[in-house]
Protein backbone atom coordinates (compact mmCIF):
# COMPACT_ATOMS: atom_id res chain seq x y z
CA UNK A 1 0.00 0.00 0.00
CA UNK A 2 1.37 3.40 -1.00
CA UNK A 3 2.20 5.88 1.69
CA UNK A 4 0.23 9.08 2.06
CA UNK A 5 1.63 12.03 0.09
CA UNK A 6 3.71 14.30 2.32
CA UNK A 7 2.84 17.99 2.17
CA UNK A 8 5.83 20.36 2.21
CA UNK A 9 4.40 21.85 5.39
CA UNK A 10 5.45 18.65 7.13
CA UNK A 11 9.07 19.29 6.18
CA UNK A 12 8.74 22.88 7.37
CA UNK A 13 7.29 21.66 10.67
CA UNK A 14 10.35 19.46 11.15
CA UNK A 15 12.62 22.46 10.54
CA UNK A 16 10.72 24.62 13.03
CA UNK A 17 10.86 21.89 15.64
CA UNK A 18 14.61 21.45 15.16
CA UNK A 19 15.10 25.21 15.48
CA UNK A 20 12.68 25.44 18.43
CA UNK A 21 10.87 28.34 16.78
CA UNK A 22 7.22 29.34 16.95
CA UNK A 23 5.07 30.18 13.96
CA UNK A 24 4.94 33.90 14.82
CA UNK A 25 8.75 33.97 15.08
CA UNK A 26 9.16 32.33 11.69
CA UNK A 27 6.55 34.57 10.11
CA UNK A 28 8.44 37.59 11.39
CA UNK A 29 11.76 36.31 10.04
CA UNK A 30 10.20 35.59 6.63
CA UNK A 31 8.14 38.82 6.55
CA UNK A 32 4.90 36.94 5.90
CA UNK A 33 1.59 36.69 7.79
CA UNK A 34 1.61 34.03 10.50
CA UNK A 35 -1.57 32.61 8.98
CA UNK A 36 0.42 31.61 5.89
CA UNK A 37 2.77 29.51 8.02
CA UNK A 38 -0.07 28.00 10.07
CA UNK A 39 -1.89 26.97 6.87
CA UNK A 40 1.28 25.47 5.39
CA UNK A 41 1.93 23.46 8.53
CA UNK A 42 -1.64 22.11 8.45
CA UNK A 43 -1.37 21.19 4.75
CA UNK A 44 -4.15 23.66 3.94
CA UNK A 45 -2.08 25.86 1.64
CA UNK A 46 0.22 25.20 -1.28
CA UNK A 47 3.79 26.33 -0.95
CA UNK A 48 4.24 29.17 -3.45
CA UNK A 49 7.33 30.38 -5.29
CA UNK A 50 7.36 33.43 -3.01
CA UNK A 51 7.44 31.29 0.12
CA UNK A 52 10.01 28.95 -1.44
CA UNK A 53 12.33 31.89 -2.08
CA UNK A 54 11.93 33.15 1.47
CA UNK A 55 12.51 29.72 3.03
CA UNK A 56 15.53 29.04 0.86
CA UNK A 57 17.13 32.36 1.79
CA UNK A 58 16.49 31.81 5.49
CA UNK A 59 17.39 28.11 5.72
CA UNK A 60 20.21 28.06 3.18
CA UNK A 61 18.38 25.60 0.93
CA UNK A 62 17.19 26.04 -2.64
CA UNK A 63 13.83 27.38 -3.72
CA UNK A 64 13.73 24.52 -6.22
CA UNK A 65 13.84 21.99 -3.40
CA UNK A 66 10.77 23.51 -1.74
CA UNK A 67 8.88 23.79 -5.02
CA UNK A 68 9.79 20.22 -5.94
CA UNK A 69 8.34 19.05 -2.62
CA UNK A 70 5.10 20.87 -3.47
CA UNK A 71 4.91 19.49 -7.01
CA UNK A 72 5.65 15.95 -5.84
CA UNK A 73 2.89 16.27 -3.26
CA UNK A 74 0.42 17.51 -5.88
CA UNK A 75 1.38 14.75 -8.31
CA UNK A 76 0.90 12.03 -5.72
CA UNK A 77 -2.47 13.44 -4.66
CA UNK A 78 -3.57 13.61 -8.31
CA UNK A 79 -2.37 10.05 -8.92
CA UNK A 80 -4.47 8.82 -6.01
CA UNK A 81 -7.53 10.76 -7.07
CA UNK A 82 -7.36 10.50 -10.86
CA UNK A 83 -4.70 8.02 -11.92
CA UNK A 84 -6.85 4.92 -12.33
CA UNK A 85 -9.60 6.78 -14.18
CA UNK A 86 -7.07 8.38 -16.53
CA UNK A 87 -5.43 5.02 -17.25
CA UNK A 88 -8.84 3.51 -18.05
CA UNK A 89 -10.10 6.31 -20.30
CA UNK A 90 -7.05 7.52 -22.20
CA UNK A 91 -5.41 5.16 -24.64
CA UNK A 92 -1.64 5.39 -24.95
CA UNK A 93 -0.60 6.69 -28.35
CA UNK A 94 1.06 4.12 -30.56
CA UNK A 95 4.46 5.18 -31.78
CA UNK A 96 5.52 4.22 -35.25
CA UNK A 97 9.11 3.47 -36.04
CA UNK A 98 10.64 4.07 -39.40
CA UNK A 99 11.82 0.88 -41.07
Where would I find each of the regions flagged by the language model?
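A short, Lys/Arg-rich alpha-helix, primarily the initiator
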Residues: 1-21
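Hydrophobic side chains within well-formed alpha-helices
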Residues: 8, 62-63
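Short polybasic/polar patches that bind polyanions
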Residues: 17, 28, 57
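Short alpha-helical DNA-recognition segment
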Residues: 21-39
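The DNA-recognition helices of helix-turn-helix-type DNA-binding domains
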Residues: 33, 44, 59, 70-73
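Short, basic-rich loop-to-helix N-cap that marks the start of a DNA-contacting helix
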Residues: 44-57
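Short, charged recognition helix plus adjacent turn
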Residues: 65-99
